[in-house]
Amino acid sequence: MEVTQMTSPIHNYSEIGKLKTVLLKRPGREIENFTPDMMPRLLFDDIPYLPIAQKEHDYFADTLRDNGVEVLYLEKLSAEALDAGGEEVRNHFLEQMLTESGYAAGSIHDALKEYLGSMNNQDMVVKIMEGVRKNELDFVPKDLVSCAENQDYEFYMDPMPNLYFTRDPSACIGDGLSINHMTFVARQRESLFNETIIKYHPRFANKGIHVWRDRNHTTRIEGGDELVLNNHVMAIGVSQRTSADAIQDIAKNLFKDGQYDTVIAIKIPHNHAMMHLDTVFTMINYDQFTVHPGILGKGGQIDTWTITPGKNEGELNLQHDTDLKKVLKTALNLDDLDLIPTGNGDPIIAGREQWNDGSNTLAIAPGVVVTYNRNYVSNELLRKHGLKVLEVISSELSRGRGGPRCMSCPIVREDLKK
């Protein structure tokens, strides 16, 4: 079947359809505007060297463009959305950002609002992203908390170094998206940018876009756990960053609309190295997947639950299984499939290359993937399995613990030919 006409600004019905439009965030000062002491707080393991990280990210973006992909940037769309929304939207955005930064009211709130409010929208967005240090404001707080408890902390508003992982704050599913309540405080403000873009940017506003789950929840879900396997099946990781109750929420909403009828929940280890499903498992062709051997138990077992609509609206049926290959073959109606092990299954190589995002491949067409060049064992294995591998440079970007899939939020893909 030929590609269907795309009338919605969001059209993403698979992990592997030819990528047409993607959302990126070019690394800015936020990735170096912190100290080693702040790394645990900001969920980072290292501090990238910004000039090289930017060159690497530009190479990544150019690789996508060279393959026919339209590249949009979060920082630009955010400012354009505020421009389009006018003063009321700008004020609401700033108030919400200050509230979520810990300043719903008070003298610090007022000082920050005056400082940020004096900027144009583009400069304000960039400054919020890179963080606001105390020495930037001509202001001395008088409250006891600031004077007695937080006097040695350098920031009023923390930087957001994880923003270049645009996969996580939102996930485009079908003709809609989830705008995610993220797990850790360090990242929870990020999805406010996505919400603002969807509501007010002329490209997306008032276009009938489904919001499958908004950010105003207490249960956690992140886009790295959300895999759109085809036009009616999703896989979602039960992980450090995504909870089972959030998966049930989004499944009910998808089923109610009728676009999707199956969600496969896959339980992975709850740790930093394997924070999302896409750090250990990705779809790269109709019948091919990467998988990190470290998530599989004896005999290749892993807990999965296939969720389908129940008899009554809002009810869910669950089918537990530990044979991932069988579950995928059944859900995707495949006779067989190819699970390609990270690092060729070698325990040392697999562990090293998974840490450097060897499992985090981005498919830009069926059988065509973008990977980090540093994971040479996994890359060569992919080629031996018939895939076209486009390597991108990665010495600094990889320090953030995310690969090509993490750094990209597909907005439009061509439909798969049936």
Curated annotation (Swiss-Prot):
Species this chain originates from: Lentilactobacillus hilgardii
Compartment(s) where it occurs, according to its Swiss-Prot or TrEMBL record: Cytoplasm
Similarity comment text for this entry: Belongs to the arginine deiminase family.
Active site: 406
Pathway noted in the entry: Amino-acid degradation; L-arginine degradation via ADI pathway; carbamoyl phosphate from L-arginine: step 1/2
Protein origin, superkingdom: Bacteria
EC nos: 3.5.3.6
Alphabetized GO MF terms: arginine deiminase activity
GO BP: any one term: arginine deiminase pathway
Originating gene: arcA
GO cellular component terms given for this protein: cytoplasm
Major localization class: cytoplasm
InterPro entries the UniProt entry points to: Arg_deiminase
Matching Pfam families: ADI
Classification via NCBIfam families: arcA, PRK01388.1
Catalytic activity: L-arginine + H2O = L-citrulline + NH4(+)
Family annotation (PANTHER family): ARGININE DEIMINASE
Annotated protein name in UniProt: Arginine deiminase
Keywords, comma-separated and alphabetical: Arginine metabolism, Cytoplasm, Hydrolase
